[in-house]
């Protein structure tokens, strides 16, 4: 009992507030052992002060809380699922393996059943049944999340959208696409490009991630600077609520002010309030001309000045302004054998333009490049207009995450800060950690003020971890930043929410959860902190 | 009792669902007469079938419901307010007049007190007191709404944001503005233009409307096509909840995925869930070049083809594509003495470009104009690049609403439809009404699929109204449109919500209202329908 001094669960009696029930879940867990929850990432348990701010396990706020008293899946349940989804109720442990572990292989669940419905009605029947039986459910898209949000923590039933991959409609006048939640982002991109449109979002995981998962996690990615967030581009959603009711908000209108915009509740709530089954989204025209420039800067200050100059001179054709530091480049060369196309620099920039007139775009880009080269803001650079070369330059930015996985163990932080502060955190962290870390690297979306801070060590190192956290969160909070800019909170970051949100806001989130999912069956242990007071 | 056969109110006992309490409120109302509610717009009461779909008063779903049993303002209450807001507690009936009636002079309340706090703390103390005393409150910004959402229906206390007009901060690197809710949109525009930025929204009412009201109503306006909706550009809000608690979500980050995005609840909920006291908003750079073209088309089909061509050729510099029909032009000439700058046509288009390179923009615009003139899509046109001429061309679109007010009585509809359908509704309505209406005119935002359908008669005409409604809503619903694209529902449209939203969605809205404002004191009788089942 020493380890988890407090735990919280959704109260069944109150629909308004989560209530903290000390010891109750622990007692249940103890009775129902063995629980097979295993957080590979976190295993050290130290005796430190119980901090209310950091939730159930103050020594290790990312660790899984005790299993909540959900029912266990019985043979009778399996019979129900098999009758409902013949051939699509998976219980073979080998087939379940990849769905029980996240992409980073840091969170390991132990679910015994994976359901693969094809229709909204199927999802509805599953949730109605699970809600009645008090069975917990983990909705899963492409399972590419980085915060342990898309895998079970214990034995939650995995509800996969992988067979829900139909495009319902595309209107080539308005550019509005309507499709099922399980469509893979890259497949949608190909579908649209054939029709002279593009998706308003793009990210490294596009080959696997599902649009439903993108919406559930409010994915940002590489095009946010230009096309804005999913909160603006998603026009409609169909969602199945915890009790199986289908909420049809699948509008295909650019403007609709009839009542509260319910779909916003489900964007970014990581499957904890409902399961998204279909999406309608506003897609931009495919640009007639795309150019990518890869530039080098000798300081972050020069990089920022280049960004300012770029926004002024490229204006409406600027579609991405990304950066990586020299340490990232070293890892790309070392592990992925990618070649640095320019001379070595402390900082590299990827600039993309997308416009409707190739001549105009090239002229703007060349004027900009001339300006930043003659003023010595940029020390070297290369430009690509041809698709293969564009892809090669982009891969230098997109494959940093992959390169890092070869380094041993990676501690990942996804931070929003005022743009002029983003690299200060990397430099300060290097000073702070001294020789403890193998690498402290920074890359990300300058245009959005979004830093991906990654710290590597040969293997898991809890002394290193203790030096990073909560230091990184305190640093972020001090500058009124966000401790999760685009990755979400999932399992790993849930208890750090108070560094970015006041307690009144978190309490209200708990009320919303309790209203929509009173039994708490949807993606438990995710997003919201263990203790909401 | 015949008139209002059912009425609903927020249940005090349940936080989960609105409950329908037949007759209860009626009884209270009868005891507490005189109630001075007067809906100027609607006075006819006919004996028709009670339609559940259309709420409390099926003959006249826009009419005010009976007064709910809120407390009446006492001398003791006034003493409290005067101590809290010395000199800013207005009870002089002459001074209250303009705050009791909407801009269109169609909804008339009878509030006896107008409060003008300067700070969030002031708003908090007012709401805490009103919630405890069960006093209803009508939040009011610039009072420019068109659906009766910003004026009291009975004796609700008017809580004005007019003295909350401070700019807190502007970051000229990120373009993020943070200000109080009562800042007038045009003042913010001037403030930003001096700093080489612009507001991401612009609308005809800019000289009076408040940014807090814009956000509360999710105002669309003229720049939505380019800069997207407030759901994407508003980065943070500070909101005072019904019980006086301050919810600080005033982030200034472009990306933040830490938990549910609570601010979205308050965008577009018309002050029924909380009072917005401060806003942070992402502002675009001021474009270096602006051009406006005013064109004529001989059919709506040609107008649509011009739109398609325009999107392709102007691409990223297109910032507005608006239209008005010949009837609108006649009214502009007749009542406002504006001059049509081109030859007479059935349809007129206002196209605005905004870009970073004047030469490129002019070249794109000229190429586009050459294309649409030589292909005869457009019959005549004029272009302005100079500010005064740009303003003059824009006024032809912006002042249509004003011209209509001179026509006698106007029935206003703000409809979203698939863009190729928007003028069909105008033509069909003309056929349907025959000689009953004086004018049936259409104008609006083609780029957003948003039609402003306006029907005039010399004076209020209930036979005409009965011919328009619910016909117009049924027509819209048949094409899966929105019965309120950007104006909101307010008092006038609240009971028509079911034409655009399924009952499950409306019930969930009721649950959210009950959770955040269990006594229902915030802007009662607005947004949600009288009967939620």
UniProtKB/Swiss-Prot annotation, chains A, B:
- Would I find Ribosomal protein among this entry's keywords? no
Q: Keywords for this entry?
A: FAD, Flavoprotein, Metal-binding, Mitochondrion, Oxidoreductase, Transit peptide, Zinc
Q: GO terms for biological process?
A: malate metabolic process
Q: Where is the FAD-binding PCMH-type domain?
A: 107-286
Listed SUPFAM superfamilies: FAD-binding/transporter-associated domain-like, FAD-linked oxidases, C-terminal domain
Stretches assigned to coiled coil:
none
* Keyword Hydrolase annotated: no
Mind telling me where the transit peptide is?
1-55
Annotated GO CC locations: mitochondrion
**Gene that specifies this protein:** d2hgdh
Residues where (R)-malate binds: 397, 401, 412, 487
Residue numbers binding Zn(2+) = 445, 452, 486
Q: What is its EC number?
A: 1.1.99.39
Q: Which family does it belong to?
A: Belongs to the FAD-binding oxidoreductase/transferase type 4 family.
Q: Which residues bind (R)-2-hydroxyglutarate?
A: 397, 401, 412, 454, 487
**Which function does this protein serve?**
Catalyzes the oxidation of D-2-hydroxyglutarate (D-2-HG) to alpha-ketoglutarate. Also catalyzes the oxidation of other D-2-hydroxyacids, such as D-malate (D-MAL) and D-lactate (D-LAC). Exhibits high activities towards D-2-HG and D-MAL but a very weak activity towards D-LAC.
Q: Which top-rank group of organisms is this from?
A: Eukaryota
Query: What is catalysed by this protein?
Result: (R)-2-hydroxyglutarate + A = 2-oxoglutarate + AH2; (R)-malate + A = oxaloacetate + AH2
Its cofactor is:
FAD
Q: Which GO terms describe its molecular function?
A: (R)-2-hydroxyglutarate dehydrogenase activity; FAD binding; zinc ion binding
- In Swiss-Prot or TrEMBL terms, this protein is called D-2-hydroxyglutarate dehydrogenase, mitochondrial
Give the originating organism. Danio rerio
- Locate the residues binding (R)-lactate: 397, 487
Q: Where in the cell is it found?
A: Mitochondrion
């Amino acid at each position: 009992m020493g380890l988890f001094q407090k735990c919280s669960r959704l109260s069944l009696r109150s629909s308004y507030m989560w209530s903290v029930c000390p010891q109750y879940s622990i007692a249940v867990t103890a009775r129902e052992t063995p629980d097979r929850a295993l957080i590979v990432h976190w295993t050290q348990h130290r005796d430190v002060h119980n901090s209310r701010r950091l939730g159930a396990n103050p020594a290790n706020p990312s660790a899984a809380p005790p299993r909540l008293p959900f029912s266990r899946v019985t043979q009778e349940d399996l019979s129900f699922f098999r009758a409902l989804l013949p051939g699509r109720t998976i219980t073979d442990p080998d087939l379940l393996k990849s769905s029980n572990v996240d992409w980073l292989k840091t969170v390991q669940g132990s679910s015994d059943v994976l359901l693969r419905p094809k229709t909204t009605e199927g999802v509805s029947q599953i949730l109605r049944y699970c809600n009645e039986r008090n069975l917990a459910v983990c909705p899963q898209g492409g399972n590419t999340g980085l915060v342990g949000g898309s895998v079970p923590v214990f034995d939650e039933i995995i509800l996969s959208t992988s067979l829900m991959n139909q495009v319902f409609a595309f209107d080539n006048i308005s550019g509005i696409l309507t499709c099922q939640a399980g469509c893979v982002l890259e497949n949608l991109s190909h579908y649209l490009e054939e029709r002279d449109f593009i998706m308003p979002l793009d990210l490294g995981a596009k080959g696997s991630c599902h649009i439903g998962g993108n919406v559930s996690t409010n994915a940002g990615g590489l095009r946010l600077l230009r096309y804005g967030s999913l909160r603006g581009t998603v026009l409609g959603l169909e969602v199945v609520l915890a009790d199986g009711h289908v909420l049809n908000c699948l509008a295909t209108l650019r403007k609709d002010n009839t009542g509260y915009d319910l779909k916003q509740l489900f964007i970014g709530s990581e499957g904890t309030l409902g399961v998204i089954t279909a999406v309608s989204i506003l897609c931009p025209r495919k640009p007639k001309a795309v150019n990518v420039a890869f530039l080098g800067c000798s300081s972050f200050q020069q990089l920022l000045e280049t960004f300012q100059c770029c926004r002024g001179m490229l204006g409406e054709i600027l579609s991405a302004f990304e950066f990586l530091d020299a340490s990232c480049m070293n890892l790309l060369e070392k592990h992925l054998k990618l070649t640095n196309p320019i001379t070595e620099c402390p900082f590299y920039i990827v600039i993309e333009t997308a416009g409707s007139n190739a001549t105009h775009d090239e002229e703007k880009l060349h004027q900009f490049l001339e300006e930043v080269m003659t003023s010595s803001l940029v020390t070297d650079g290369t430009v690509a207009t041809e698709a293969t070369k564009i892809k090669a330059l982009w891969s230098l930015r997109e494959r940093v995450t992959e390169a890092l996985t070869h380094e041993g163990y990676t501690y990942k932080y996804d931070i929003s800060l005022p743009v002029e502060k983003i690299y200060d955190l990397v430099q300060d962290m290097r000073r702070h950690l001294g020789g403890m870390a193998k690498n402290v690297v920074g890359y990300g979306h300058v245009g959005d003020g979004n830093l991906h801070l990654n710290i590597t060590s040969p293997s898991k190192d809890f002394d290193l971890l203790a030096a990073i956290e909560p230091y990184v969160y305190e640093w972020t909070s001090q500058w009124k930043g966000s401790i999760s800019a685009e990755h979400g909170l999932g399992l790993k970051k849930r208890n750090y929410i108070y560094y970015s949100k006041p307690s009144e806001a978190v309490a209200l989130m708990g009320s919303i959860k309790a209203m929509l999912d009173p039994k708490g069956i949807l993606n438990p242990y995710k997003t919201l902190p263990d203790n909401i007071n």
